[in-house]
């Protein structure tokens, strides 16, 4: 069985070692995030879009402002991934920049911004998202419907109901799922319904 005092000493050393390793892991994670943030301004397009995507997966709030700046990158590859990553981070500092990005001429940035707003689930995005249900690009319309369902406010109900007659089946399906999510949220049947869209 061993000497309890010796075993206690070993346990303490193990805990200290674990804490030390955890601190080292956290330090490496912070360095990795700083590296990705630096890559957002790299001359290489591939480096910038990969960094924008990685920062969303890292989930660190220190990336919010750099990703907001990346919404203005000259290439849409970076812009739309920055928008998606901002949604993944879930920080409301991204709300206004994402709403502004909905006005872009590029369908990919509008799509990424709508997706990001859906992930944020902030009621202030409802009115800016509704016009996208009539966007000329079906991917934008579909993503806007999805986002409105995720937000789950009945103020979007009339516009989503109108979208049930969209020419594209996938847009109609997204609108129906969004309406179901709003209904379920209101009745309390399935509070997570919006996340299943």
Report the location of each language-model feature.
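N-terminal "cap/leader" segments of large eukaryotic alpha-helical scaffolds
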Residues: 2-42, 50
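Core register positions within helices of long alpha-helical scaffolds
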Residues: 23-27, 54, 85, 116-119, ...
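Positions within the helices of HEAT/ARM-like alpha-solenoid repeats
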Residues: 46-48, 77-79, 108-110, 139-141, ...
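Helix-adjacent hinge/juxtasegments
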Residues: 88-90, 105-109
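Strongly charged, low-complexity linkers/loops
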Residues: 127, 135-146, 150
């Amino acid at each position: 069985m061993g000497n309890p005092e010796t075993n206690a000493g070993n346990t303490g050393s193990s805990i200290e070692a674990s804490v030390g390793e955890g601190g080292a892991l956290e330090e490496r994670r912070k360095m990795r995030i700083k590296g990705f943030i630096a890559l957002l301004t790299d001359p290489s397009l591939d480096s910038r879009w990969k960094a924008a995507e990685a920062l969303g997966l890292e989930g660190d709030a220190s990336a919010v402002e750099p990703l907001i700046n990346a919404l203005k990158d000259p290439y849409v590859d970076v812009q739309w991934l920055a928008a998606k990553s901002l949604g993944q981070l879930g920080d409301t500092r991204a709300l206004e920049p994402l709403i502004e990005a909905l006005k872009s001429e590029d369908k990919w940035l509008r799509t990424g911004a709508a997706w990001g707003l859906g992930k944020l689930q902030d009621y202030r995005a409802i009115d800016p998202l509704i016009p996208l249900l009539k966007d000329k690009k079906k991917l934008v319309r579909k993503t806007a419907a999805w986002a409105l369902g995720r937000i789950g406010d009945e103020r979007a109900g009339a516009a989503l109901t109108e979208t049930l007659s969209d020419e594209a089946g996938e847009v109609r399906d997204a609108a129906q799922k969004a309406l179901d999510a709003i209904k379920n949220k209101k009745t309390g049947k399935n509070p997570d319904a919006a996340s299943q869209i």
